[in-house]
């Protein structure tokens, strides 16, 4: 690919110049003319490249999150005790019940890892529905513009799909039992403010938030790091080199 194409794509992706506010996809495509005997980069190529970028991102993100300890040993997305129950955990540790708190925390993350296995089809559906308008918005956007597109189009479906998985895993791993015991023990302490946060809703949303964080990381890699562009169309659209 000639260096002119690379430069133009780089400018689109970086979106660092004020003039990009006047970005016109048609004009960009007109400037993609290649030497005789070669083809132009079409709107379809750009959309295809973006869809592949998102697919790579969600595949890597989902795989990372759904493996054993994908949540539990990743401090970026590890699910901890709900904020409303932090005092519960702290108090129980002081009472020598830290192991129960640890078991509960592990169960939360196991539930997230199980739920993450269900995410890819939902993300793929959103990606295949992407329009040229969506693609232009993503190209002009920030480093996490594609991730924000997925947040807008998948959050509710993910929640509806994840909730029963989280519910089932929490029950299977006795997290609900641990949690109930923790809260009950705490609430029986004289003069403390009683707590009982919605554990299942909390764990479900934190699972979704964790996935988006991982996908945002993958998106940034693809935008910034040529090595992360694993297919020819990604190399073309995201301008890996002057080839």
Which residues make up each language-model segment?
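Metal- and O2-centered redox machinery and metal/ROS homeostasis
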Residues: 39-42, 47, 51-54, 114, ...
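Residue-level signature of catalytic and energy-coupling elements of molecular machines
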Residues: 61, 131, 226
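Sec-dependent N-terminal signal peptides
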Residues: 4-15
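N-terminal Sec/ER secretory leader and immediately downstream segment
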Residues: 24-105
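Mid-length scaffold segments of soluble, non-membrane domains
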Residues: 98-169
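Boundary of Sec targeting at the N-terminus
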Residues: 20-22
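An amphipathic alpha-helical core segment
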Residues: 165-206, 211
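A cross-kingdom marker for long, charged
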Residues: 27-32, 200, 207-243
């Amino acid at each position: 690919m000639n260096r002119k194409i690379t430069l133009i794509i780089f400018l689109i992706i970086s979106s660092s110049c004020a003039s990009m506010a006047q970005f016109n996809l048609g004009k960009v495509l007109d400037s993609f003319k290649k030497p005789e005997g070669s083809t132009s980069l079409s709107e379809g190529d750009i959309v295809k490249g973006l869809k592949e970028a998102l697919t790579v991102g969600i595949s890597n993100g989902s795989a990372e999150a759904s493996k054993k300890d994908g949540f539990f040993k990743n401090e970026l997305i590890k699910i901890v005790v709900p904020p409303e129950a932090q005092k519960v955990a702290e108090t129980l540790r002081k009472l020598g019940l830290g192991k129960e708190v640890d078991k509960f925390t592990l169960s939360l993350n196991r539930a997230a890892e199980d739920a993450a296995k269900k995410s890819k089809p939902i993300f793929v559906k959103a990606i295949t529905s992407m329009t040229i308008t969506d693609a232009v918005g993503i190209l002009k956007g920030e480093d996490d513009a594609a991730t924000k597109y997925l947040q807008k189009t998948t959050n509710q479906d993910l929640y509806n799909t994840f909730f029963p998985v989280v519910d089932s895993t929490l029950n299977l791993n006795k997290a609900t039992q641990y949690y109930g015991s923790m809260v009950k023990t705490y609430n029986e302490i004289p003069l403390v403010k009683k707590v009982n946060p919605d554990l299942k809703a909390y764990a479900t949303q934190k699972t979704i938030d964790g996935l988006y964080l991982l996908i945002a990381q993958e998106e940034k890699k693809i935008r910034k790091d040529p090595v992360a562009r694993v297919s020819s169309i990604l190399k073309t659209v995201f301008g890996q080199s002057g080839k």
